Amino acid sequence: MKYDKLIIVESPAKAKTISKFIDNAVVIASKGHIRDLPVYSISVKIEDGKFIPRYEITPDHKKIVEDILHEAKDKKVYLASDEDREGEAIGYHIATILGGDIGSYDRIVFHEITKSAILKALENPRKLNMHAVEAQETRRILDRIVGYKLSPLVRKKVDYGLSAGRVQSAVLKLVNDREKEIAKFIPVTYYELPITVRTDTPASLVSHKELKITKQCLQDKQQALAIKASIESDKFKVVDITAKKASYKPQPPFKTTTLQQAASTELGYEPSKTMSIAQKLYEGVETPTGRKGVITYMRTDSLNLAKEAIESIRNKILTMHGKEYLSDAVRIYENKTKGAQEAHEAIRVTDVNFTIEDAKRYLEPEQFKVYKLIYNRTMMCQMSDSQIENQTVLINGTENVIKITGRKVLFDGWTKLKDKATEDIILPNYQIGSTIEIQAVQLDEKQTEPPARYNSASLVKTMEELGIGRPSTYAATIALLLNKGYVRTEGKAMYITDTGSKLSNFLEEYFPDIVDDKFTSNMETKLDEIALGNTDMHTVLGSYCIPLIEKIEKGNTDIPSLRVPDKRTGETCPSCKEHELVIKTGRNGEFKACSGYPKCKYIERPKVPVESKENCSYGLCPDCGEVLIKRDGRFGPYYSCSGYPKCKFMSKWPIAKEKCPTCGNWQQECASKTGETYYRCLKCKPIQPRKKDKKSKKKGQ
């Protein structure tokens, strides 16, 4: 068969899937950008107010470029990179190396990788969007100048190995500011009075005499005790019973941020992991009808759904669940995200007939979990409202008013697809005028809590709300902060590290624009304006980069150094036996290193006191039997063998003293996402729940 088409996509997985749909086409993957700014220099020339980038074919793309040039000789070329600014730029660079008129190349786009979508795209090609290319190039140059000009100053004035970035530094400030809020928070003690009436029904206090009871209003213990005594001695009667019906609409289909948030909350996945899994589902997996993409493009801030998709979703709801579960009218969701690209679709499944049951048989476990989230949200968004009857019983005493609330699900609607259904709270059959007996009144002492630390879900949500970054950069930005050791996690909570705090405080003091969320958001708006053709790259870059470069050059001499000077030890390096050992300060504290670096890379880890085997806190090494030591790493605490470097055992969790009851091997003492402790054998890996001490939850009794 003669191949007369060359389709150039970004990823090999996508190429593999598309090649099964088109018989007369060669499909090649560019594997991302074939040209980029080389890493060995800033590679941006500023001349007469113009910013001129110098691109090179990256070393690992030279063979791919040769293949593209060879295959393009006698074929019609279709540029089929992703439909976003990065994809548009990738297509532009490919067209550039192919030569000729850039405007002569056909550009095809699709939001799902199915045969019908690819054929439709081939029938409706367009030309490269040069405004989108210019917006991407502006972002690339901007980030290069910030990174290559500001980062050396940061390393010179703050510490080795640090870096600054336009988006990453603004996000780092969010985490740092939250840490400051928590540090200065002063807790306030307050009291609550949970009430139980006869038949074990919980009730709450509405008012006492003239005092309206609100959360945290009782901060005097004697006052709370007096009210408690008043309730216990009061006589109560039902004075009002109301039942109000309420409708609850389903949530819209997923976009990038809401998918990342749902996967973080429900599955415990980091945004980068969610996007990696979603990428595979988009590019193509095996299904009962062959290999295809099973979700639409996953980097989107749109809530739009294609007309054909809505029809198939609604038909599936009708056949699977019946007419009563289908919304009366088609649900259309409005985009509230600033700069949302309406041409894109929301994230949805491409084929509603590839059901959750099918997916469980064909997909890997982690892929299945993400697909299930997307499938259910795809269906829910066109289902009928859930109907709830909320019941309130108002009960008056001589000095106190209390209330009892209940709930009855009249119709589950879209909540039918939730893993955890809304449960009824059925109340006894109360009558107006009937007497109510108080069964118990507790006095609970509580304290106000500081603002919650960010987790992946809440940080992504805040980035979106403030306009910091774009859907394609959220996950990568968070991963970067973690990988560089500026932020660490404990469970889901994000903590600023000493290094991250020091860096953020420095940037906030000397380069406030870099870390200001409003400034960063405004820059994203300017990039959107370039993409719309309302302004140009040189105007935007000139207004920002020239003053920044001048400020950095001035800072090289004017900003005092915050770096801790090396301390001399008088000891000779045991490795090179030439230079003196010095004490340096790194991310995790002080350490000894050779002053001859980088010629000699000797490092001496700080000595940690080793406990006795009989009284060790973190268990014994399962490999050699030596005591485990707790250390602080760039990703948080970990446990390693005190016999290092002879034994290189490391573990995220300490080793339990109790051995596995199944095989007698060593076990890790782990903590679940909810903070509960469990044991995990290193050999057979069964999970053994830890026995809990029975403690009363009641206070003040």
Report each predicted region and the residues it spans.
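Basic, low-complexity terminal or inter-domain segments flanking catalytic cores
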Residues: K2-K5, K16-T17, A25, K75, ...
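C-terminal or mid-to-C-terminal helical accessory/interaction module adjacent to the motor/catalytic core
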Residues: I113-I195, K244
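Short acidic, hydrophobic short linear motifs in intrinsically disordered regions
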Residues: I241, P250-A263, T289-Y297, P450-T462
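Metal- or metallocofactor-binding catalytic centers and their adjacent structured scaffolds
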Residues: K215-F254, S434
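A short, conserved structural fragment
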Residues: Y282-T296, K484-A493
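Intrinsically disordered, low-complexity regulatory segments
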Residues: M1-I141, K149, L218, Q439-Q442
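Short, hydrophobic-biased segments on the C-terminal half of alpha helices
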Residues: M275-Q279, I478-A479
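Conserved short loop/turn motifs at secondary-structure junctions
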Residues: Y3, D82-E83, D159-S163, A243-P252, ...
